[in-house]
Amino acid sequence: MKSPRLVAYSPEVAAELGLSDQDCLSEDFCRVFAGNRLAAGMQPFAMCYGGHQFGHWAGQLGDGRAINLGEAVCPDGRRRTLQLKGAGRTPYSRSADGLAVLRSSIREFLCSEAMHHLGVPTTRALSVVLTGETVVRDMFYDGNPQLEPGAIVCRVAPSFTRFGNFQIFTARDDLDALKKIGGLHDSQRFSGIGRAGAADLSALVRGSLSLTAEMVVHWQRVGFVHGVMNTDNMSILGLTIDYGPYGWLENYDPDWTPNTTDAQGRRYRFGNQPKIAYWNLVQLANAIYPLVMRAESLQQALSVFSETFAAEWSATTAAKLGLSRFDPDKDEALVGDLLQLLQAAETDMTLFYRQLADLDPYAPAGSAADFVAMLERNSYAPLAAELRDRALAWFGQYCSRSRSEAGDPEARRQRMNAVNPKYVLRNYLAQLAIDQAEQGDFGLVAELLDVLRNPYSEQPGRERFARSVRIGPNSGRDVRCCLAVLDRAFTVFCSGYCTELPGWHTIVPFG
């Protein structure tokens, strides 16, 4: 690359890899993570994978612009793969240039680290480096391409193996390659998820099912919408991967997606993410079937998803409401009524749950007025009389349920604040940081990164980072902060690649 320049790095990821601040600020660091030179022991490679895009088999897809530098052994003995995204073409790039721009690289860098500190399983990001070169991109896909600053983000993960890495070899009937990739998932590296034998590959599916269910529960907990849950964007380890047109819910809307290419079908909308995750896992089971040849064992493995998701989501829902446990007989209706209320009032999900912790359900009835005021303060639609009545009724039920546990108010508040973040990476915040970075000022990127390291803490003096740009007397209801269309790092479904996969085994029917 022409003249690489460091934009930002993650001190936590660097420390995990055994790198000091001095290392990260060195010229060598910049050259290595711009792809200009290799450190000792690095052996770059790209991986071949296929996948289903928007429910259709799309053939071979990548790695189109991801280059693995190799595997690092951390000071604590753990292994981490380092991967450059945007460093140029690979043998699997097809017609693409393999490059990335600054805006998408900053979005991936900030979101990877934000998700980690939120407690969401994710790939990590070590650094963002400007390349000193420009890249042509049609930002709005309207036939008006422009030059943008190029950049490279360094991802870090135990493995970048995707569902699609298995799928492509099944599609090609290449059982030898399929066995090899299955054999890579040994107990030392992947904590016993699977080995190459048939029984162990069923265990691999079972382990991936459990990890994926836990990941999606966390997505739903914090209001994260991935946007492109194609099978090639699913990690075998249940890590959030490929941050393209992602977003966080502003107003609670289970039908919302930040991906403008999915605006009509809304396949990857917030409320559909658990179902899509399961659908993708069925495709993983299909891909592994030729090595197992026992549909029953895979069907048994697939049952893990619903069990794990239900258990994890029940516990998470209780914690979000400050309850010590989820009682289906009492709480299913309570939660259902709340979500309907939040949707009708267009309530900001993040702000609502965080501020609900500040209300005392054990106090006299006067706190009901405080609840309605809080709901109105954090809603994008005016509260009509009918919604106020519904809000009062719900809060009365919530207070009664909370009192039934005879809990301590402060313990309740702490329990809620441990799972309901104050700070998330709202799209407008990411865009403000990008705008400044494109002018050569990386200060807001650094400050945002620092704020997002402690999303559950109050952080006095930084309250502006918790605000929604849509709330306030001058915001207007038409202001939308979905800037996902600006991001080039997502795969658009191309009907030209849509073919049915021959010999596909249907393990579980799925509607």
Language-model regions, residue ranges each:
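Hydrophobic residue at the +6 position relative to the catalytic HRD Asp in the kinase catalytic loop
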Residues: M229-M234
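Short, solvent-exposed positions on alpha-helices
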Residues: L82, T123, G227, E296, ...
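Short, well-ordered loop/turn and helix-capping segments at boundaries between secondary-structure elements
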Residues: N286-R294, D358-Y362, R377, S400, ...
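ATP-dependent phospho-/nucleotidyl transfer catalytic cores
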Residues: S104-S105, V135-H226, L237-L342
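Helix-loop elements that line ligand-binding/catalytic pockets
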Residues: A295-N420, N427
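General N-terminal leader/first-domain-start detector
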Residues: M1-P4, F371
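Conserved ATP-binding subdomain of kinase catalytic cores across diverse folds
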Residues: S3-L6, P11-F29, F33-G197, I236-I241, ...
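Active-site Gly/Thr loop motif
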Residues: M42-G50, T260-D262, E405-P409
